[in-house]
Amino acid sequence: MSSLEEDKRLNSIQYLLQSAAVCRALGGKRIIFHSGSCGKQSREAALEKALDTMRRAVEALDEAGFADMTLCPETMGKVGQLGTLDEVLALCGVDSRITPCIDFGHLNARTLGGIQTKADYAAILDRMAEVLGDDRARQFHVHFSRIEYSAGGEKRHWTFADTQFGPEPQPLMELLAQRQLTPVVICESAGTQAEDAQTMQQMYRAARNV
């Protein structure tokens, strides 16, 4: 979406249209996507291109009959990629139907371990609510896994058993329960998605005393 080449940006819109058709056929409503990398341009220039592509994508989806679909730009794990929290929230500002996909493992990786405490999670949730409003922020999309990182950000996804890698899921599940937030949460652990998703569900239910 942020490419210097217009053809590639236009192709991104077509990919979203194709994804919308498949999503509808499967009974889904949310389309998660990556907004691109900065490449040889500044972050500001890359974001402006992505914002323009996003506006065109929303228009194209509406014209094609997919106005009921929710676009979800994802926070990204590599430093060179477009996808900081604020960049994703800026993309969400294009249309009130756009919902952020917050990948907490990615944010932890690109900030080189910036999510260490419950307060760190709370700051992310607070920022979403500040920019989007409480109602939109309540129903965001979540990807979660422990991720190994280097100086450039994300390297590899791991499992919940690999506790040498962060971030920790427990504080997030507690905050979701305490704040009565209702995101869609997808576990992206390496090979143990179902098991680790169940672990998060148990943490969430315990925090709600269910």
Across the structure, where does each feature detected by a protein language model lie?
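C-terminal helical cap(s) of enzyme catalytic domains, especially alpha/beta-barrels
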Residues: 194-210
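A structural signal for the main folded, soluble domain(s) of proteins
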Residues: 48, 54-56, 60-70, 115-119, ...
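Short acidic/polar active-site loop segments enriched in Thr and Asp
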Residues: 29, 182-183
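Gly/Pro-rich active-site loop or hairpin
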Residues: 3, 44, 82-85, 108-182
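Active-site beta-loop-alpha junctions enriched in small/polar residues
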Residues: 36-38, 74-78, 105-110, 142-149, ...
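Conserved beta-strand positions in the central sheet of alpha/beta enzyme cores
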Residues: 32, 101, 143, 185-186
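Active-site acidic/histidine proton-transfer and metal-coordination neighborhood
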Residues: 1-101, 109
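Short helix-capping segments at alpha-helix termini
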Residues: 60-68, 93-97, 132-136, 178-180, ...
